Amino acid sequence: MTMATHDKDVTRALQGLEDGSSSVRLRAALTIGTAPDPRCVDKLVERCAIEPDFSVREMLTWALTRHAPDLTLPGLLGEVRSERAQARSQALHTLSKIGDRRAWPAITRELLSDADDEVARSAWRAAVVLVPEEERTELADVLATQLGRGGRETRLSLSRALIALGEVILPTLGAATAKGAPAARQHAIATERLLHDPDAAFEFAIEEAKRVVALGTPGQEGQ
């Protein structure tokens, strides 16, 4: 392929990212990811913030992961501070896929407790990928402040994030079980159950946790 031909393909793909058809936008993102070009990075990041189609957003993220982190991190780190929730969420999601720990300082307590559930869930996933080993316990403590939050998907996302940290979460879950609000206690108990039994269904773990909380502290129900 000549340089002129490549330049034309890049121009066509960048234009395709703004097409009214989601299938055209999807193909454009695929094309860019297949033949990465630094000139496309800014547009990919920009589109992540506003792209309405989930499949296209996933392809945009994939295309960004195909470029060198030195090129993608600056734009993505700027987006996590955006006022637009989708920009924050998709940037965090992409950072979790890139997995470059230079992004860790950008995962702030504010993002981990973001009022938007999608942003918070993306922040949790990114955090457990990027956190340095020596900060895992501190991260578990921050994540535990969100126990009991939201509906099923949000709670399951938080449980998975906590479980990904491993057994360092046990003291944190124990504290939440002993002193938390009922919803947080239920969530903490269910999360510990899933840590020890990954094959258990989340709904079953929650229902079991509700019974434990209703009866009192864990272990009392058999007394």
Specify the residue positions occupied by each region the protein language model found.
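Structural detector for internal amphipathic alpha-helices that build alpha-solenoid repeat scaffolds
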Residues: 1-6, 12-15, 22-37, 46-47, ...
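Alpha-solenoid HEAT/Armadillo-like helical repeat scaffolds in large eukaryotic proteins
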Residues: 12-16, 43-51, 75-83, 106-114, ...
